[in-house]
């Protein structure tokens, strides 16, 4: 038994010496141990006395070492310690402390990167200690994260604005406010620009509103022509209320006087449309005596439409090529107004218009006017029965013929099928409800030449109302208020650009040789009849 006791003492001595080595806090003994195969040594930072003092603070470190069973060799223990540090350090480095502190990431700013990295290293060391404390105590403490943001805010204030999105002192903030200010400025500018437009569209005081209320005002022109027009147009922008009131009063007086004067001596009669025409014609002398000549030259009564019916006569030897046309009032009595026929021996289309259906010659007493076209047949001029200035009629200006209207059909060179486009030029009306006389002494002073040169002094330009395509019927349609029943290329409506709802002239087919013709102020029967005749003539370049 003495051998066994000696061996036990040796074992006890070896065990006690090993325990003393494990309990000793001297670090230089650990680097001498070799790690296991497949693992690399981790370079250790030189430990300062602060780190040595901080090691005893780690709670539970000695207990874990006592609880672990003794290893057979020193190499496995060294591997375990190195492996533990290898696992612990990456976990701390992988975790971003900014996630706990909710600090926004600032853009890269060159010289400030070093200071930020140093602060991140300090945070990593603090996080390692916090994790170890959490493992030992198994409790989560939220106090350190609350203190850290305050410190960061102090540092950020000391360093100055970095352009952080979350910081209130970011330099981008004033740029955004500037943009908003610019936007507000543009809005104000737009409002300022819209200001004068809104004043121009004033429904109460603008001349356009008065023209819509009184359609006759659209056709009023002064004796001075464009000069007076220019003065009237320049008045509203000045902004003086007195001038506006004066203009309104003048327009109202002119319209009122025109209504009173343009009553055809029966303006007090009650009724509308056809009834008025009937009463006027019934109280007038018989048609054959010569009273129709005055009626067909007078403008239509204001506020009423004169409804007529136009018939075409193709019977006879030459009526197929040169038919005759007759205009009657569309009433029960069918009062005759005008007749027209195309002349045979003429280089261009030439229609003679008379107030006697039995005598359609130029030398007749009832000859009242004519319609003449150019060589292409797309431009027409309406004359009264005055003398031609080129044939010895230049002595007395009052005896020269007047140009009552001009019609221009837009050429269709490419041959596309579609509705016609018309432009009608007529003389304007003065304050006495009389037509401004246009008596050109040469060919360069007519309505068509003035229209081409855009010198529309004392003139009114009208256009046909564009029809609307109807997919159901597969044709172009216009609202004729039931006055037109058949489709035709000759159907049209003439309107003014200022008021497209005010139909000055309406023409359309109701039978093979019957058409309706309704006209309103400022047209007269002769003008309306001649414009309708121009649609019958063949047009080489318009169809």
Swiss-Prot record:
Region (Disordered): 1-290
Listed Basic residues bias regions: 267-276
Membrane association type: Peripheral membrane protein
Chief localization: cytoplasm
Keywords, ordered alphabetically: Cell membrane, Cytoplasm, Membrane, Phagocytosis, Secreted, Sensory transduction, Synapse, Vision
PROSITE patterns recorded: TUB_1, TUB_2
Traits of the deletion mutant: Malformation of photoreceptor synapses, followed by photoreceptor degeneration.
Extent of Acidic residues compositional bias: 110-132, 244-255
Signal peptide location: none
Gene Ontology BP term (one): photoreceptor cell maintenance
Compartments in which it is found: Cytoplasm; Cell membrane; Secreted; Synapse
Family statement drawn from the similarity comment of this UniProt entry: Belongs to the TUB family.
UniProt function note: Required for normal development of photoreceptor synapses. Required for normal photoreceptor function and for long-term survival of photoreceptor cells. Interacts with cytoskeleton proteins and may play a role in protein transport in photoreceptor cells. Binds lipids, especially phosphatidylinositol 3-phosphate, phosphatidylinositol 4-phosphate, phosphatidylinositol 5-phosphate, phosphatidylinositol 3,4-bisphosphate, phosphatidylinositol 4,5-bisphosphate, phosphatidylinositol 3,4,5-bisphosphate, phosphatidylserine and phosphatidic acid (in vitro).
PANTHER family membership: TUBBY-RELATED, TUBBY-RELATED PROTEIN 1
UniProt-recorded name of the protein: Tubby-related protein 1
Gene source species: Mus musculus (Mouse)
Gene this protein is translated from: Tulp1
């Amino acid at each position: 038994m003495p051998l066994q006791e000696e061996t036990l003492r040796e074992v006890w001595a070896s065990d006690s010496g090993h325990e003393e080595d494990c309990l000793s806090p001297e670090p230089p003994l650990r680097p001498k141990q070799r790690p296991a195969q497949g693992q690399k040594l981790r370079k250790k930072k030189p430990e300062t006395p602060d780190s040595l003092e901080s090691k005893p603070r780690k709670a539970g470190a000695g207990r874990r070492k006592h609880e672990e069973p003794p290893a057979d060799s020193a190499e496995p223990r060294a591997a375990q310690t190195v492996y533990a540090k290898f696992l612990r350090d990456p976990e701390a480095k992988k975790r971003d402390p900014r996630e706990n502190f909710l600090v926004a990431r600032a853009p890269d700013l060159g010289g400030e990167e070093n200071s930020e990295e140093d602060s991140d290293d300090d945070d990593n060391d603090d996080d390692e200690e916090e994790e170890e404390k959490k493992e030992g105590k198994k409790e989560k403490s939220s106090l350190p994260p609350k203190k850290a943001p305050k410190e960061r805010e102090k540092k950020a204030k000391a360093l100055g604005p970095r352009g952080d999105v979350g910081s209130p002192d970011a330099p981008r903030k004033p740029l955004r406010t500037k943009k908003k200010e610019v936007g507000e400025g543009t809005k104000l500018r737009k409002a300022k620009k819209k200001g004068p437009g809104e004043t121009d569209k004033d429904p109460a005081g603008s001349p356009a509103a008065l023209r819509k209320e009184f359609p006759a005002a659209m056709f009023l022109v002064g004796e001075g022509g464009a000069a007076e027009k220019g003065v009237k147009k320049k008045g509203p922008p000045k902004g003086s209320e007195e001038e506006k009131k004066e203009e309104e009063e003048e327009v109202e007086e002119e319209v009122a006087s025109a209504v009173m004067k343009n009553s055809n001596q029966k303006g007090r009669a009650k009724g509308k449309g056809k009834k008025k025409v009937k009463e006027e014609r019934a109280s007038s002398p018989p048609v054959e005596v010569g009273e129709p000549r005055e009626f067909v030259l007078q403008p239509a009564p204001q506020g009423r439409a004169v409804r007529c019916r136009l018939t075409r006569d193709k019977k006879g030897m030459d009526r197929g090529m040169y038919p005759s046309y007759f205009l009657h009032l569309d009433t029960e009595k069918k009062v005759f107004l005008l007749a027209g026929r195309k002349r045979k021996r003429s280089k261009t289309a030439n229609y003679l218009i008379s107030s006697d259906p039995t005598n359609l010659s130029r030398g007749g007493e009832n000859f009242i006017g004519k319609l003449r076209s150019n060589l292409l047949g797309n431009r027409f001029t309406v004359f009264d029965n005055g003398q031609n200035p080129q044939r010895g009629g230049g002595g007395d200006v009052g005896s020269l013929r007047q140009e009552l209207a001009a019609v221009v059909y837009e050429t269709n060179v490419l041959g596309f099928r579609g509705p016609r486009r018309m432009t009608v030029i007529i003389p304007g009306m003065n304050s006495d409800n009389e037509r401004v006389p246009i008596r050109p002494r040469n060919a360069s002073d007519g309505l068509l030449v003035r229209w081409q040169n855009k010198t529309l002094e004392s003139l009114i330009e009208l256009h046909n109302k564009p029809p609307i395509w109807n997919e159901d019927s597969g044709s172009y349609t216009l609202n004729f208020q039931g006055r037109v029943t058949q489709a035709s290329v000759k159907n049209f409506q003439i309107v003014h650009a200022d008021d497209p709802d005010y139909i000055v002239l309406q023409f359309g087919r109701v039978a093979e040789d019957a058409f309706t013709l309704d006209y309103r102020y400022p047209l007269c029967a002769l003008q309306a009849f001649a414009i309708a005749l121009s649609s019958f003539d063949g047009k080489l370049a318009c169809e």
